[in-house]
Each structure stands twice: as structure tokens, then as C-alpha cells.
Amino acid sequence: RSGSVVSPRSAPRRISCDAKDINLPVLLSAATFEFAFIAFDLQTDHRFSAVDTAIHDLVLASTSDQLREDVAAQVLSNLFPIGGFGALTLSTLFLLFGLTPSVKTRLGVAWGVYISSMAAVGVLKEAFARPRPSADILHSFAFPSGHTCAANVLTGLTLFVLLDPVWDAAKKLVGKNKAEYKSSQDELGRADVKTQDLQVAARPPILGMRISFWIFASCTTATGRIEGNRHWLSDTMGGAALGIIFVCLALMLIQQFEDAFVSDGID
């Protein structure tokens, strides 16, 4: 139909949080340096131990056993790792319908990065074999914090990798339903315009909001691990840095794929 306001084909939209929005090489370098610094300190004279011990003693002196166990260890520690895994899973299920090469790539990279990050945490824990602050936990080691890394990776993947395709799919679904409803009462042209207006008006959360929530998720989880007497401060710093590394690698990898899709004209 001539005069349609919806273009028949559009180039795949680049990932919203690429190197133009976040300086990924700088962020990756900073996170790598932080992790390497903490790891080196643990393997040498561990000068950061004074800070770790001071924070640990402060937590024990200012909180009760019940607060540490019921609130910090159970709620704060698990809120974002469990919530992030749920968000990643639900996003994947939602996107399974009408998969495009770009969406397939994002899903594959997201799950691959998450699994790889958890495998890396397991290997690093065994390699560093750092005792936990609580003498009651002897079955696993402390560095790096797996919960903090998981919260960082899962939240980052959901916000920066899958949120945009989920948002686009939801817009199309709502727009289609609205168009069908309008077309049953009005002429098709007006329904088409309404659908386009809806898709233009709807915008996903801005980058600043995503970054703020990403930081909040990591800090909340780290606080839970420290106050729950599960980890030293440096454990959570290492876990957060490791999570940032994996999220940055995921974004950079996806960007390379989507650049190739654009150049090849693949939707």
C-alpha cells in the first residue's frame, strides 16, 4: 500500500550500549586492573588485609547474628542473583518467538557469558583458596565473591544485552494488538498511524538509569555478602570487577556481530 508510514525493512538496530555510549575498552581495562591488583595483593603481602579486617570487625560489632543471617545472607545476598537469573530466563523465553539473527546472537552470548563467568569463579576460588571470614564455612573459598559476580553479570546482561530486544518485541506485540483493534473499528490507514505513533513514543530506559541500577545491584549484593559474614570486602570487589569484565566482553562481542549484520544487510 502506498503512503504507508511503516517502512518495509529497516537495518538491525545496533546495541544501545556500545563503545559510543560506554567507553568499553576503558571500563574493561579499569576492571581488569582492579581484579589484578586485588589478586596480586592476595598472593603477596596482602596489605589490604587491614581494611578487610576493619570492615569485618565493624560488621560483627554493629549487627546481630539474626540480622546477618536472615537479612544480609539470605535476602540481600540473593535478591539480585536470583532476580537476575529469573530476568534472563524470562527474557529468553519471551524472545524465543520471532527470533532474528541479531536476537539469536544476543541470547547465545548472554548465556555463554553467564556460564563462563560462573565457571571462572569456581576455578579462581580453588586457585586462590582464600578462607572465608566465617569459620563455620569450610566447604568453599572466599575469593572472588560468586554472588557479587553473578549479580553483576546477570543484571548487566539483562539491562544492556536483552532489554532492548525485549522492549522492541513488546512494542510490536502491543502495537499489533492495537492495530487489530483499531482496524476493526476504523480504516486501516488510521490504525497504521496509531501503531507507528505508539512505537515512536515508547522508549526503553535511558542509559544512565541502567548503569545506576547495575551499580545498585552489585553494591546491594556485596553489602549482603559482607554483612552476612560470607566474604571480605576485597572478595566482593574482585567479584564485581570480574563481573564487569565479562559484561564488557559480552557487549564488545555482540557489537562485532551486529556490525557484521549491518554490513551484510542481515536483519
Predicted regions and their residues:
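N-terminal chloroplast transit peptides
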Residues: 1-6
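N-terminal transmembrane-helix/juxtamembrane module of multi-pass inner/ER membrane proteins
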Residues: 8-87, 125-138
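Transmembrane alpha-helices of multi-pass eukaryotic membrane proteins
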Residues: 20-30, 106-110, 148, 205-210, ...
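Alpha-helical transmembrane spans of integral membrane proteins, capturing the lipid-embedded, hydrophobic core
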Residues: 30, 114-119, 240, 244
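Short helix-capping/hinge motifs at transmembrane helix termini and TM-loop junctions
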Residues: 44, 99-101, 128-129, 228-229
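Interfacial segments of alpha-helical transmembrane regions
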Residues: 93-117
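Small-polar-interrupted transmembrane alpha-helices in polytopic inner-membrane proteins
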Residues: 108-130, 204-224
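Membrane-embedded catalytic cores of phosphoryl/pyrophosphoryl-handling enzymes
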Residues: 135-267
